[in-house]
């Protein structure tokens, strides 16, 4: 079966984990890994796998995109450089999947709104953040039952799983995640908190979701909705688990989650990498299937859609 060729920008924790997942895909074929440090572990690993690499940043990739047939590019760098990366990639007629909190394109949280992106012709979609991918499905599970006045999420991740790019983007992480809690999760007001835990041995990713419903919560309907959403997320992140909840206290609905990774790059405690990279791969596969069917024709654009 024909596969759609992909490039990855950013050979850090997220990019390296994503590369492992793309290599198992039936419709995606990673052919380039782009970095800025020739000595980086991620570039070395990619080279060993037979992937083409450049340490000249996105400018080292652009001249080769057409010849190598690259149609989908993943950006796992930093929010600060994403807009420029996206502009250059879109000009080449390739779709950009943004794993930074830049959020210049529409948010995509697969179990909630992936189908809404089908046929919309976007050239840039944003995967929110790892905390967003873990928690927004649960906010949406409550808000599809009844209106949510306020949604608050707390993502706790191990220090070892948080690379320099993510650390530089903490403010963007909280802003972007809070925005997506509203736009995708359906809460009228959203708030996001990230906790980076330095404990050794490293702790598994844990997430807490609190929703305040406008009226008294329909406990049976919300519980059923949460369990249905849990099953949807587990289709692409098998280590996504409901630890407790939904717990009801007045109008507050609380859900407690943990996310175990597949251990593709970092060990299984780094579920935050897995949920982000699995969601990005799932999204890219949907676009790739559309391209292969001839239903999506990518057009060069001057700016991201």
Curated annotation (Swiss-Prot):
Top EC class of this enzyme: oxidoreductase
HAMAP family in UniProt: Ac_ald_DH_ac
One BP term from GO: catabolic process
Binding site for NAD(+): 161-169, 272
Active site: 130
Keywords in alphabetical order: Aromatic hydrocarbons catabolism, NAD, Oxidoreductase
Transmembrane segments: none
Protein's UniProt keywords contain NAD: yes
Organism from which the protein derives: Leptothrix cholodnii (strain ATCC 51168 / LMG 8142 / SP-6)
Catalytic activity: acetaldehyde + NAD(+) + CoA = acetyl-CoA + NADH + H(+)
E.C. designation(s): 1.2.1.10
Keyword rRNA-binding in record: no
Record protein name field: Acetaldehyde dehydrogenase
GO molecular function: acetaldehyde dehydrogenase (acetylating) activity; NAD binding
Family: Belongs to the acetaldehyde dehydrogenase family.
A Pfam family of this chain: AcetDehyd-dimer
SMART domains hit by this protein: Semialdhyde_dh
